[in-house]
């Protein structure tokens, strides 16, 4: 089973399925969904003890959040939502659970065959994005 340390590094998106449907379920407008679907972001994960930083960079937008594992924090997402978020490391996966306005979404990052597989879920919308390590 992977450790959190195994997820640390710079990852580049190489495959994406269902992202536009997931964004639509989140309530993202059409124009931003189209731009988001075209973006090929890098995800940079850094650790300092129990402190986690996740930076997502693309030509469209760069977002960063930092948190302490297991503690709630206020996150502003790439699409502008203000969420109450908690990140945990459970069963070899980094789980990011967001809550806002009575809604919930979960983003799970885990290693599979040397790649980082990210699953984004809200209601029945499920998105899978695959990243390869570049650093």
From Swiss-Prot:
One of its GO terms (cellular component) is glutamatergic synapse. Keywords: Acetylation, Cytoplasm, Disulfide bond, Lipid transport, Lipid-binding, Nucleus, Phosphoprotein, Secreted, Synapse, Transport. It is found in: Cytoplasm; Nucleus; Synapse; Postsynaptic density. Disulfide bonds join 120-127. It comes from the Eukaryota. The modification N-acetylalanine is found at residue 2. Its main location: cytoplasm. It catalyses: hexadecanoate(out) = hexadecanoate(in); (9Z,12Z)-octadecadienoate(out) = (9Z,12Z)-octadecadienoate(in); (9Z)-octadecenoate(out) = (9Z)-octadecenoate(in). The keyword Phosphoprotein applies. One of its GO terms (molecular function) is long-chain fatty acid transmembrane transporter activity. InterPro entries: Calycin, Fatty_acid-bd, ILBP, Lipocln_cytosolic_FA-bd_dom. Transmembrane segments: none annotated. Hexadecanoate binds at residue 131. Signal peptide: none annotated. Pfam families: Lipocalin (PF00061). Forms a beta-barrel structure that accommodates hydrophobic ligands in its interior. Monomer. Intracellular carrier for long-chain fatty acids and related active lipids, such as endocannabinoids, that regulate the metabolism and actions of the ligands they bind. In addition to the cytosolic transport, selectively delivers specific fatty acids from the cytosol to the nucleus, wherein they activate nuclear receptors. Delivers retinoic acid to the nuclear receptor peroxisome proliferator-activated receptor delta; which promotes proliferation and survival. May also serve as a synaptic carrier of endocannabinoid at central synapses and thus controls retrograde endocannabinoid signaling. Belongs to the calycin superfamily. Fatty-acid binding protein (FABP) family. This is Fatty acid-binding protein 5.
